[in-house]
Every structure is written in C-alpha cells, then in structure tokens.
Amino acid sequence: MSTHSEMSPAATGVATTSASAASLQREDMAWLLRQFVADVPGVTHAVLLSRDGLRLLDSEVDKDWADELSAALSGVASIASNITGPTHEKRPARQVMIERDDCLLFVQSAGQSAAFGGHPSNERGLVDTVLAVIAATDADAGAAGFEMGRLLQKFAPFMQIPVRVGTGDEVR
C-alpha cells in the first residue's frame, strides 16, 4: 500500500449541513475508490454500481465506458446470484472473476447482500450494490479480491442506495 498524504473530504474536519451530508458521503466513497485503485498493485479501474446496472461512482473512468460496464456487470452479478449450488439453493456469489486477454474483471456484491446481510436495519425500498474492479492480466487475483473486501468494509456505512421509483409507482 502506498502512503498518500491526501485526506478524504470527511477527514478534513469541515463542518457540513444535513443537506450536504449525502454529498460528503459520496465524496468520501469516491475518494476511497480512487485510493483503492492507486494503492492496490495491478488494479486499473473500479466502479460502484447499483444491482440494476446504474453507475454510482467510479475511479475517474470514462463515463460512457463506466455506464456500459455497469450495465453488463450487473447482469453478471445477477446471473451469479441465481445459480443453484450443490445444495440446490440459490446463494449470493461472493465474487465473480472474468479472465480476458486484456484484463481481469472482478465483481463482488456490496450493500445489503454483503455488508448488511441479515442486519435488522434492512428496509424496504433499497437495492443491492455491486463493486466491479478491472485489473491487469498479471495482477494478483487473490490480493485484488482481498482488498476489495477491505474496501467494502470501509464502504459499509454508505452502501444502502434507494430503489428508483417512477412517477406514480410505489415500491413493493
């Protein structure tokens, strides 16, 4: 891990109003995501997405590519969580790794399924989130996966994302 002197927005001690608290949390998460990419050897990009495929945050990735990646990898996460195992039960996938000629892709469930599974504060109207990481082909897959888990522990307080609801729709 490198030792960056840069501090997260919350660590600066700047007082905020309740209206800007959500913005500060988002900035803190974005800072953690950028630091993760800077600190973990071989990792080149990271995207936090909603389970339904919307890009929430990224590590300064091209926005069009991050949007495309978010849509595709939410599908990967969905498929992985709907495969029955040897017990004939659907269980959440802890991690999916895709090995390509040009990169390694890692997908881990975040939010309720990883950070808040079985927690009594789970409320209706929330959607799971997913962390996607892109690494070089020679990256240490075990180290990248381990560091993703550590990042998700740091994200845990921020991981509940409201479900999108259209006009006239209600959350069911």
Q: Predicted segments — roles?
A:
Residues 1-45, 51, 55-172:
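Non-catalytic interaction/Regulatory regions outside core domains
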